[in-house]
Amino acid sequence: MVYGMMAGPVAVVSHTLSPDLNGQAVVLGRLFEGTPPLVRLSSDRFWRPQAIPGVIDERVATPWAIRKLRKLRFMEGTVFRMHVRHRARGIERALVQHRCSSVVACTGGDLVDVPAAIVAAERAGVPCVLHYFDDYRSQWKIPNPAWSTRWMERNGASIEAEVLSKASGVVVPNELLKSDLAERTSSPITIIRNPVQLDLYETLRGSLPAREYNPLRCWSIAYTGSIYEAQLDAVRNCARGLDVLRGRGIDVRLHLYTAQSEASLQAQGIPDSVHVHPTVKPLDASRVQCEADILLLPLAFVTRYPELIRTSAPGKLGEYLASGRPILVHAPTESFLSRFARDQRWGMVCDTLDESQIANCIERIVREPQLRAELSQGALAASRQFSEAVNREEYSRFLKETATFRKALRSSSLSA
């Protein structure tokens, strides 16, 4: 079968899809919105999709009997390949049944998804594009209850090398990850920003009343999203910086809109002075972002996976930029996030884990109206790169182009 000759829906394999509210599910929903037919294949056995016209939803989760075998740590390689074989059969069945023209395999919380999609695509004779929401090789270094750390560290690089050798193309969210991957694969790589609906934010910005910028009033910093190891120490340090500011007579309150509970966050060192709110739906998150005085964009400084932090592009980045609010980036200096903010002048960057330093950054935003104006203008200018319409069109174009980029197909050892 020659790639590019088929006419049929695209299939997307992911551990999370709408109506989930996390960044990956929201981004996929935006990229594929209005472009049916589409086949969505979820590896989450608890996924309960909502019916969407033109969209076919199926679960390809691993059954209990196979999952139970993961306890046999002495034969993890065999068990992993068993997981890949089973999931690949489910994906292949869907590809053939629905006459799919290609499949997009997303990195994420389930390490089996990517190799299983590669195997299924080979068997079905369709191209497979990898969507790197994060660096797949780095994800093998994150502790995972399904597999032992020792086995993951030994096998992650070789498994990634094989899937990259068989991919028809790779989608990445930023330049730094593209540069890293260019050294590991000859497949075409394109940058697709995590998209945002710019006209929605324009409407929200226009509906807000004029702000009173008195340094002596109470100011708000907002963060919308998950908080785990990848953000935790940066969020904690920001909260401590606000205590420093109170000693200087500046009242700033941190508001976290997150799925993590207040008790859980406090147990991890987030002070009780922080206002913790339940996670909100995308439209409500947009309002929160536009109404905040300052937006916090954190990435952790001390983690077990620094390479993942270095190349990370948070799904909310485009939303923050489109809000036009001053953005406080608290992230390591070598991270894509810090580099991007500095290069395009849209964020105040604090790249040291020091409460006095972040207090100084916040104080500058509060006291300097010209700085706030420059940050807002820079954010709005940078947000155009995240246009939902532009990135959706580029995504569709890349999927069509990679359908003509044929790899020399050979028997895969991933499921052998």
Identify the meaning behind each predicted range.
Residues M1-V60, L242-G247, A416:
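N-terminal subdomain of nucleotide-sugar transferases
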Residues E212-L232, A239-R240:
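Conserved donor-binding/catalytic core segment of Leloir-type glycosyltransferases
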Residues R89, R93, V119-R123, Y136, ...:
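Membrane-proximal helix-turn-helix segments that form the acceptor-binding/catalytic region
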Residues L371-Q385:
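A short, well-ordered alpha-helix in the C-terminal region of glycosyltransferases
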Residues L176, P195:
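Carbohydrate-associated surface elements
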Residues T258-D293:
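Nucleotide-activated donor-binding/catalytic signature segment of Leloir-type glycosyltransferases, i.e.
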Residues A230-D233, L283-V288, L295-L321, I327-R339:
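Nucleotide-sugar-dependent
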Residues V196-Y213:
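Acidic anion/phosphate-binding donor-loop and adjacent secondary structure
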